[in-house]
């Protein structure tokens, strides 16, 4: 155990590679970071290295337009927040704030109960 540099006998396959004893990088690969010697990606300072995509922060439509009451009879407005499958679209997709999302879902449910909005899509 004192001598780590032992000479090994040739393997049955005929090819022999010296082992470093550790779990380091393979012999043929260059050392360095995840990109090796290539350097940074060209382009902007985005997460993915230059993708030209800017996502606007979603704002609540009801807060911007100063709509206080969400009317259950306004089918055109409520229909914007209902998917084709009939599900209420979540606020992370629409950008509606929490208090307005609660009022919106109550108005959609009320409109469904009096048959102004369908519960599910008509296939």
Curated annotation (Swiss-Prot):
Molecular function via GO: small ribosomal subunit rRNA binding; structural constituent of ribosome
Lineage: Bacteria, Pseudomonadati, Acidobacteriota, Terriglobia, Terriglobales
Compositionally biased region (Gly residues): 20-34
Organism: Koribacter versatilis (strain Ellin345)
Comp. bias (Polar residues): 1-10
Family annotation (InterPro entries): Ribosomal_bS18, Ribosomal_bS18_sf
This protein's name: Small ribosomal subunit protein bS18
Entries under HAMAP family matching the protein: Ribosomal_bS18 (MF_00270)
Keywords, in A-Z order: Ribonucleoprotein, Ribosomal protein, RNA-binding, rRNA-binding
Region (Disordered): 1-52
Function per UniProt: Binds as a heterodimer with protein bS6 to the central domain of the 16S rRNA, where it helps stabilize the platform of the 30S subunit.
GO biological process annotation, one example: translation
Any Pfam family: Ribosomal_S18
Any GO CC annotation of this UniProt entry: cytosolic small ribosomal subunit
Subunit organization: Part of the 30S ribosomal subunit. Forms a tight heterodimer with protein bS6.
Membership in a protein family: Belongs to the bacterial ribosomal protein bS18 family.
């Amino acid at each position: 155990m004192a001598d780590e540099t032992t000479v090994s006998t040739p393997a049955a396959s005929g090819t022999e590679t010296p082992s470093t004893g550790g779990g380091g990088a393979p012999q043929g690969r260059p050392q360095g970071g995840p990109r090796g010697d290539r350097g940074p990606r060209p382009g902007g300072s985005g997460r993915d290295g230059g993708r030209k995509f800017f996502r606007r922060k979603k704002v609540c439509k009801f807060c911007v337009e100063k709509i206080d009451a969400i009317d259950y009879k306004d089918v055109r407005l409520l229909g914007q927040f209902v998917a084709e499958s009939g599900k209420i679209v979540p606020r992370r997709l629409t950008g509606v704030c929490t208090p307005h999302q609660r009022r919106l879902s109550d108005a959609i449910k009320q409109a469904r109960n009096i048959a102004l909005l369908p519960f599910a899509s008509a296939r």
